[in-house]
């Protein structure tokens, strides 16, 4: 397959500079050291820049050279100020697109240019990959995202671009191009993996959007910067990706049944593809080398677009034809189509993740100027950071411990909630609960469950009635078969029904057991309804009349609350004459309850102030520690602090001592206040009126909890009942569908057995007629031989074996082939049964039974039972019938039936005609002609069956698992009319096949 051409960014070029002398000058001036000691380090940095200039644009090695130089610049920036006022080096870089030179003394400009080249190398490496190979495809996908990440880093960290290629809008356009190409590469992989059409459409839509964004950038913000071939290529890619998105979305719409919308999307895809083809043809054959595109880019794009356009047009013709002749759905206009959803699969990889999983230190190398600015300084700073972290952890633990002690003490005293009770706030405890109101509102307007239960009972009765009807039909058919076997003996070679209808009977029994199991669940639901029906009615009425508070108050009264009239006429646990504890006045000099409560509240306020102050102090301490930086101190004292780091750390940590002391003082103050609170509140609780009030509150609380628990149980029962009824409705709906499908299979089985029996009966009668003439011939031969023995005349000479003279003992020629019975032409022909070729060869001149071809596809191999040593029978085998045969002429006797007699032998079923012998097929469970496998009954647990090795998966009972179709009026009418056979049956009930005599 032709590979789509990709755009790669050109690299910036730079002039050679000298790092050595400026660095040596700065070392001499600022550090006071001999610069010659660092000659090797300066030369190493200078060589890194020279190597970076010659880095290959499409290899991982070039990327690593650029990144190594960039990493050393980052380390250098921590030690040497490279700018116009300190280390003055002119960095000259040429614009990647306009080739104009730009010179600056800023190290940031040097680093931005290096990152730009890293991005360009990544994009080149990605564009040159062979994406037909899985490794190449993954490499291209990763590198396009990494390139976008490096360009993003430029836009976020270098705000003032000195050149056009580093301009924010230019870089943003490059980001969109690389991300769009990464999205396209990911789409190619998903198309090769044959993912779902809807998923592919979203990926293509995102790619088209990114290419459109890139086009907008080239035309509005970066106009004239990029080569025209780039703009044309972006136009092709945008239109092509839009066509791909519409194409796959059309396929998805077609799969979902929206054929008219699919046609409209294919028309849109054709439009986009035609536009893309026009743009692709406009690509020039000779392209500038600076674009990194080859001369094959144009022809490759033309081939890709043409191939896709052919697919679109082919699918469009198919969809239009299907919609015109089958679906007849309206085709919306292009404006009426919804946009295809976008799914981003390519994201910019951050710089920090460029070498994820690799040893970055190995790529960057050791710090070149480690001797000048030792890394030990950094290590010492890390040790100091750990000391600060220890301090913060210790102070945080003190604050959390104090807060926990306060919370535990207040919770033990039930403060401040208990003060509200003592001040008369207990009336709130008898107000209706919001949750209770919500329960009543949810029950409001809900219909009674009785109607739903009646419907369930009706559905269950219908299911059981259908199952009973199926069982009766099978019993009737089996009885008829065995009566014919009793009448004709060994000549009646039709297989016993008991083995053929085993699957159907098992299904009937299984479904009936399932319904009986469901009846137990129905009984549980009914018991729940009887238990809580009155409560449901109360809550429903309260919700509809907005009197939930009345119901709640009544429930509280029943639970044992004290009584006193309220405005609603309902009793309340408080009486208006009781008054409040705050109204009590003591004359013996003891503080009143109100005064004691005020003292407790005052202490609580002080405790809250202490807690807030302590929390704020800890917050300030953390902020100060986070902003503390002693790097300069460590650098200035790097020679004097060797071995004395701990003393330096202690001196530096002293700046946090005031905050530590404030936390300690707050903890001491809290301890004193808690002691005072314990004494004051204890005295308050010892007051007789307070103790009585508290006892009353506890009683009301228990009553309230009891009421809420009761109605919570009622509410849960209501929800569970509703959920259970929905599950039951779903169960019986599925069960009805399953049983209707079973009924169709039973009808099909009965019809096939009737046809087979009628054909066998005709065969037996023809053989009897032929057998009568043969018997007369044998009697004449016996009489002639007897006369010869009694005769006194000499016997004539014997005839040699090879003589052509015909003797009396001439062997009989084989009987002529049995012809299909002829039926009167004056009878209106019913629907003809399907005609099938025999599948079992005829052996030893004996006609055998053949199964219709469609049966075998439902029979699992290896599951059959052989009835005769010399041949195998398929269960449910029916002899093929003539085209004009009416299978419904097989009557069903209306009289009661006796149990089928057991037969010790089985004979092959005669067949009226024979085609070509085929190998015998192992028999399996009988599957009637036209058998529609019913779905398994909706039970809580399904039995596990061994996997089928046949052409179709098998489910319970060996059925092929397919979706059963529901019942229809035709089948219902057929099942009701089938037992009515006509007067001939009632006239001769002893012979169930008597009705067939009228056909001759």
Swiss-Prot record:
Record PROSITE patterns: BRO1
Bias (Pro residues) ranges: 898-922, 931-954
Coiled-coil annotated residue ranges, if any: 732-793
Keywords: Coiled coil, Cytoplasm, Endosome, Protein transport, Transport
One Pfam family this sequence matches: BRO1
Main location: cytoplasm
CDD domains the record matches: BRO1_ScBro1_like (cd09242), V_ScBro1_like (cd09237)
Membrane-spanning parts: none
Compositional bias of kind Polar residues: 840-849, 981-991
Domain BRO1 as annotated: residue spans: 5-406
Keyword NAD carried by entry: no
Basic and acidic residues bias locations: 764-792
GO CC list: endosome
GO annotation, biological process: protein transport to vacuole involved in ubiquitin-dependent protein catabolic process via the multivesicular body sorting pathway
The organism's place on the tree of life at top rank: Eukaryota
Subcellular location: Cytoplasm; Endosome
Annotated region described as Disordered, given as residue ranges: 760-857, 891-1000
SMART domains, alphabetized: BRO1
Physiological role: Involved in concentration and sorting of cargo proteins of the multivesicular body (MVB) for incorporation into intralumenal vesicles.
Assigned protein family: Belongs to the BRO1 family.
Name of the protein in its database record: Vacuolar protein-sorting protein bro1
Taxonomic path: Eukaryota, Fungi, Dikarya, Ascomycota, Pezizomycotina
